[in-house]
């Protein structure tokens, strides 16, 4: 939970997003936070970093929604080390949600 808040705060500090983006986070393999129905979903996992060390990471899903036009999000990035999540999500926000980088950081 603390990691999700820290990443979200960094995204808020660095990005201007024109509309709300629903981000769901879970460490539960049963997807208790329903990451597949979020605009961007993060499912905790163990992965390897650039030095092949086992670290905490996330699988990233995008495009989920509920309602009449329901759709499960697609797995777009698998095993992203947590330290690398912010730049990956910044690019997703730009590409899929019309976000821009803030210049007055």
Curated annotation (Swiss-Prot):
Binding site for [4Fe-4S] cluster: 28, 32
Bound cofactor: record note: Binds 1 siroheme per subunit. Binds 1 [4Fe-4S] cluster per subunit.
Record's GO cellular component terms: chloroplast
InterPro entries for the chain: NIR_SIR_4Fe-4S (IPR051329), NO2/SO3_Rdtase_4Fe4S_dom (IPR006067), NO2/SO3_Rdtase_4Fe4S_sf (IPR045854), NO2/SO3_Rdtase_FeS/sirohaem_BS (IPR006066)
SUPFAM superfamilies per UniProt: Nitrite and sulphite reductase 4Fe-4S domain-like
Stimuli inducing this protein: Strong induction by nitrate in roots and hypocotyls. Strong induction by light and weak induction by nitrate in cotyledonary whorls.
Biological processes per GO annotation: nitrate assimilation
Pathway: Nitrogen metabolism; nitrate reduction (assimilation)
GO MF terms, alphabetically ordered: 4 iron, 4 sulfur cluster binding; ferredoxin-nitrite reductase activity; heme binding; metal ion binding
EC numbers, comma separated: 1.7.7.1
Tissue-specificity statement: Highest expression in roots and hypocotyls. Some expression in cotyledonary whorls.
Domain of life: Eukaryota
Top-level EC class: oxidoreductase
Residues annotated to bind siroheme: 32
Cofactor list: siroheme; [4Fe-4S] cluster
Pfam family, one: NIR_SIR
Location relative to the cell: Plastid, Chloroplast
Keywords, in A-Z order: 4Fe-4S, Chloroplast, Heme, Iron, Iron-sulfur, Metal-binding, Nitrate assimilation, Oxidoreductase, Plastid
Catalytic activity line of the entry: 6 oxidized [2Fe-2S]-[ferredoxin] + NH4(+) + 2 H2O = nitrite + 6 reduced [2Fe-2S]-[ferredoxin] + 8 H(+)
PROSITE patterns: NIR_SIR
Location (main, coarse): plastid
Quaternary structure and partners: Monomer.
Family: Belongs to the nitrite and sulfite reductase 4Fe-4S domain family.
Name this protein carries in UniProt: Ferredoxin--nitrite reductase, chloroplastic
């Amino acid at each position: 939970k603390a990691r999700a808040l820290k990443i979200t705060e960094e995204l808020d500090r660095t990005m201007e997003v024109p509309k709300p983006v629903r981000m769901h986070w879970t460490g539960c393999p049963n997807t208790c936070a329903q990451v597949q129905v979020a605009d961007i979903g993060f499912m905790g996992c163990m992965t390897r970093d650039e030095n092949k060390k086992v670290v905490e990471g996330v699988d990233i899903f995008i495009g989920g929604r509920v309602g009449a036009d329901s759709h499960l999000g697609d797995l777009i990035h698998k095993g992203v080390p947590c330290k690398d999540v912010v730049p990956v999500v910044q690019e997703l926000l730009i590409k899929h949600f019309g976000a821009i980088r803030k210049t007055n950081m």
